[in-house]
């Protein structure tokens, strides 16, 4: 049976350290503050905002919310971002995405309007460049791949000299995860939809990060004994039993019943990477406040 790499243990340890750092900042007269920018009243956006606010309050981070109507123009949003950039009391900014359909074509321009020093969720090109150059002074890494690194660190999984395979090449998870693993001196291979013999490639990995976003795509054919599997994806499985006694629940990429007995360690879904991601966001806010 594989060791479960539980996100709660990582989150609890990380939160405890962040609370200490938040208190130290307050003793110096600095109140770490997160600005949350939301356009519209999408229920999933509201849920995400609620979760982020709750975690911030637990750690001792102040939250300021900036809400624009669903039909807000690009100019309205850019003006708001400029105002937040000029507000020295706000150290980090979370812009709830995706933006409404009429703003999607301008999303890159809108994201890059944000001051990279306040970009705690890696929305700007400069922050992304920092990930690829290994320069944290340029910005913060995306929270999800950073959460993967927190899990590896917490459980003492050394990446140096290890073969790591990342499934997925998105700019949000796959590519930055690959760069961050290289930063830990792993030898990294990235698999994607055009990769030939993906299962064979994955079986050679010591550390396998699955960020395909495809339910049941990671089967026992992709893994071998001794591997560490980080299942990043959050998918909906309509056939998975839920806590209410019915069907329909969150699941990762892995066919868990197949993969778990075959590997050394694995992150469950839910209860793995996702639970760490929000605390990583708060870590970035604290770090941004410490840099002021």
Residue spans for each PLM region:
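Glycine-rich phosphate/diphosphate-binding loop of Rossmann-like nucleotide-binding domains
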Residues: 39-53, 136-232, 237-240, 247-260
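Short, high-confidence coil segments that cap the C-terminus of an alpha-helix
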Residues: 89-90, 205
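Short, well-structured alpha-helical segments in soluble
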Residues: 76-88
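Rossmann-fold NAD(P)-binding glycine/threonine-rich loop
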Residues: 108-119, 124-132, 233-292
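Positively charged, low-complexity intrinsically disordered leader regions
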Residues: 1-30
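Anion-binding alpha/beta catalytic cores of soluble intermediary-metabolism enzymes, centered on
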Residues: 92-159, 216
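Short beta-strand segments enriched in small/hydrophobic residues
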Residues: 31-40
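Short beta-strand elements in bilobed, periplasmic/extracellular small-molecule ligand-binding domains
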Residues: 56-70, 188-190
């Amino acid at each position: 049976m594989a060791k479960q790499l539980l996100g709660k243990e990582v989150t609890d340890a990380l939160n405890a350290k962040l609370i200490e750092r938040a208190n130290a900042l307050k003793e110096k007269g600095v109140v770490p503050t997160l600005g949350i920018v939301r356009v519209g009243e999408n229920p999933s956006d509201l849920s995400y905002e609620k979760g982020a606010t709750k975690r911030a309050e637990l750690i001792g981070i102040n939250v300021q919310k900036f809400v624009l109507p669903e039909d807000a123009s690009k100019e309205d949003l850019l003006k708001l971002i400029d105002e937040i950039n000029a507000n020295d009391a706000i150290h980090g900014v979370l812009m709830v995405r995706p933006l409404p359909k009429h703003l999607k074509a301008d999303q890159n321009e809108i994201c890059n309007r944000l001051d990279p020093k306040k970009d705690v969720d890696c929305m700007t090109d400069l922050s992304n460049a920092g990930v690829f150059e290994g320069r944290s002074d340029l910005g913060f890494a995306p929270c999800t791949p950073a959460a993967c690194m927190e899990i590896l660190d917490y459980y003492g999984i050394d990446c140096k000299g290890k073969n790591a395979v990342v499934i997925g090449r998105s700019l949000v998870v796959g590519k930055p995860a690959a760069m961050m693993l290289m930063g830990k001196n792993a030898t990294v291979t990235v698999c994607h939809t055009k990769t030939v013999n993906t299962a064979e490639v994955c079986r050679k990995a010591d550390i396998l990060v699955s960020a395909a976003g495809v339910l049941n795509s990671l089967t026992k054919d992709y893994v071998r004994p001794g591997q560490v599997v980080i299942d990043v994806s959050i998918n909906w499985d309509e056939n998975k039993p839920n806590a209410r006694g019915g069907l329909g629940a969150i699941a990762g990429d892995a066919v868990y019943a197949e993969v778990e007995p075959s590997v050394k360690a694995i992150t469950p879904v839910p209860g793995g990477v996702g639970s760490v991601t929000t605390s990583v966001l708060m870590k970035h806010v604290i770090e941004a406040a410490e840099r002021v």
